[in-house]
UniProtKB/Swiss-Prot annotation:
Taxonomic lineage of the native organism: Bacteria, Pseudomonadati, Pseudomonadota, Betaproteobacteria, Burkholderiales
Highest rank taxon of the organism: Bacteria
Record-given protein name: UPF0178 protein H16_B0290
UniProt similarity note: Belongs to the UPF0178 family.
Listed Pfam families: DUF188
Species: Cupriavidus necator (strain ATCC 17699 / DSM 428 / KCTC 22496 / NCIMB 10442 / H16 / Stanier 337)
Length: 154
């Protein structure tokens, strides 16, 4: 099991939690981004820089992900592709994407896109808050307790 992170838009606090978790449970965390990402020195943490371009990082994550891996992303289309490959998908606010909710989220994304293209100001996501950070940390810890490699300290 590995953790793949859609790192370009991932909050710094989430990346820091993932770095600590990688060391604690000895699981590989790979940040995929179209810009350089400085990571702490660790055999469990790596950064993969991809060329700039629409969905290049997402496409690379889909290439790398396997069944049972964990993907961290807020991108609904990437989440759907990762679920199709048998991965678990958690957003940085601590909400799980699942086979049960992905279609609804894709539909809502399409509706919002249509509203924006017709000139409606739909606003943006709420600012990342401490409660989001706590929710993510809790979900990550529960996941790693169930799925960490044998002998790891979750």
């Amino acid at each position: 099991m590995q953790v793949l992170v859609d790192a370009d838009a991932c909050p710094v606090v989430v990346k820091e939690m993932l770095y600590r978790a990688a060391q604690r449970v000895e699981v590989c965390v790979t940040l995929v981004a179209n810009q350089y990402m400085r990571t702490p020195p660790s055999r469990f943490i790596k950064s993969l820089q991809v060329p700039a371009g629409f969905d290049v990082a997402d496409d690379r994550i889909v290439e790398l992900v396997s069944s049972g891996d964990l993907v961290i992303t807020a991108d609904i289309v990437l989440a759907a592709a990762a679920l199709d490959k048998g991965a678990y998908v958690l957003d940085p606010r601590g909400s799980w994407f699942s086979r049960e909710n992905i279609q609804e989220r894709l539909t809502m994304r399409e509706v919002m896109e249509q509203l924006r293209s017709s000139g409606v100001d739909t606003g943006g996501p709420a600012a990342y808050a401490q409660q989001d950070s706590k929710a993510f940390a809790g979900q990550l810890d529960r996941f790693l307790a169930r799925h960490a490699p044998p002998g790891a300290v979750a």
